Amino acid sequence: MKRRLLIMFLLGCLLPFAVQAQHGTFRFAQITDIHFSPNNPNPTEDLLRSVAQINAIDSIDFVLVTGDITEEGDRTTMLKVKETLDLLKAKYYVILGNHETKWSDSGCTAFGEIFGGERFEFEHKGILFLGFNSGPLMRMAYGHVVPQDIRWMTEEMDKFGKDKPVILVTHYPLLDGDVDNWYEVTDAVRPYNIRLFIGGHYHRNRDLRYDGIPGILMRSNLRDKDGKPGYGIYDITKDSILVYTQRIGEPKKQWAAFSLTQPYYDRNGKAEKYPDFSVNTEYPNVKEQWVVQTGAGIYCSPAIEKDKVFIGDDMGYLTCYALKNGKKLWNF
């Protein structure tokens, strides 16, 4: 019995190293906050310089493009961004930023048509990468991650394996004041082996924590005060993630590092804080009659006609519920 317990103890100690050994070493780049504009040639020149320098580095396995690829989110400019990104020798993966959603002239449909979708998923040498939209979903609103994307993330990580390393890719930081339901995301992904969130939006390097989970924001690709564009480089080693800034024509500079084996947060814990819902108690005469979880985002008021409630969602469905008890009657 003692021998069996010793073997089990040793297996428990060795398991993290076994998981660690399953991934290989590699390097990838991150370009963010490109801000192409029909009225300003500088962002185009900046991206072309970054693409040329990335193409000159044989060790880049792929490129993450983390949002705000345009200034105003219009279809014509997004097509020009794609033409430029297509010059990359390495495969690239792209997500939306707030500039693609706030001022979209297509109701946020053009991005998916041009780039093949609003999120991405791939596994590279033992690490799972998941990229998703962090909003906003209405003009000038806070960022928001829709329920179907949160559900998609957890389903993908379940298939991949809870103990295997995952890197999540967004535009916004998952912070109060940036994303209104940040806590829903961090609570949902906490049980998994999240090694890092990668994002942009702030136009400068930031090393953050999202309810304990490490998060990186990379500088904008736009030229800095010295007139130099720049992007991020990530080296994945056997036990670490090394983060660099790469200014055009200069050696890369490391400014952050993260362990691939050591824990950063309690996988059984909760968000550090939650929104204040005390306003719901200010009207004691108003009583909750029923609640339905639709599994989709709803950004408009329901319509009531006689004994029925009609609700439209961001997946394109109109659903009818019974006013009395919330029973789903139909949808299309």
Walk through the language-model features, giving the residues of each.
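N-terminal active-site segment of His-dependent metallophosphoesterases
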Residues: 17-80
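Extracytoplasmic/lumenal domain signature
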Residues: 265-299, 303-332
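Active-site glycine-centered loops adjacent to acidic/histidine catalytic or metal-binding residues
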Residues: 33, 67-68, 97-98, 171, ...
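Binuclear metal-dependent phosphoesterase catalytic core
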Residues: 213-279
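Active-site-proximal beta-strand elements of phosphoester/diester hydrolases
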Residues: 25-38, 126-136, 167-169, 214-219, ...
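Bacterial Sec-dependent N-terminal signal peptides
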Residues: 1-23
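Extended active-site neighborhood of metal-dependent phosphoesterases/phosphodiesterases
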Residues: 75-165, 184-196, 206-218, 224-237
